[in-house]
Amino acid sequence: METVTIVFRVMMYILVLLVLYYLYKFLYGDSWAQKDIVVYSASSHTNGMPSNNSNVTTLTTSVPQIYPGGEYSISTWMYVNSWTTAKNKPFFTLSGGGGSFKSLVLFLGQRTNKLGVRISTTSGSKLNAAEMGKITSSSPMAPYTDNDISMCDIESVDLQKWVNVTVVLMGKTVDVYMDGKLARSCVYGTTFDADGNTPTITLGGPDSFSGYIGLTRAANFAYSPDIVYSHYQQGPFAGFSLSSLNPFSYDLTLSSNGSTIFSTSNE
């Protein structure tokens, strides 16, 4: 009889745990789970997303939830054809979907070759509509002019090649990686901010640079350096190999019994 009682109690404990688990799933879904999602994928250089489309590309499906002061990572690829000098060129934004402000904005400078990396903080400045207007104005206003170099900005971006940009948000800390390597690590006075519960990413648009945007992903956790480099190795589109970053620096040679039967080399 005592054995039956023990078994019954164990079964009841398991049942209670299952009920609590499914209740939590019902209330909160799987937002607690780590997600690393490809939100935009380009299959080749020729059909990568033209960055300066007439309309902004808005992505909401499968974008992981973002919380103020938590952890979040984004990785995107860009191919800059040329540096136009009309104005700043925002090409990536991340927001919580509330509509009040952007959590993260990436833009290229007006006349100076630089990558602007700006965030909203909980008790500091917000990237609201007025601030976004300062960025995209034909006469950019402080703190978004070419002379305004934020602690997270990158002062040089390679042209006419695919470049990977990864930004990792961790509370007050922002890490910026270029082509898989840490380029900037900066600490703000307060944590990054986010509003709403429909996380949204926008890519390109009429104010963006002349070129292409490749594979873009987002994660609700902080990428480690190994993950950043692994994503860089995967490249900007499906079927990618590292040689495609600079295809003219590689030769293809086919040989049979020691004799060359085909070669792309000019030698």
Task: Name each model feature, range by range.
Residues 1-267:
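Extracellular glycan-associated modules
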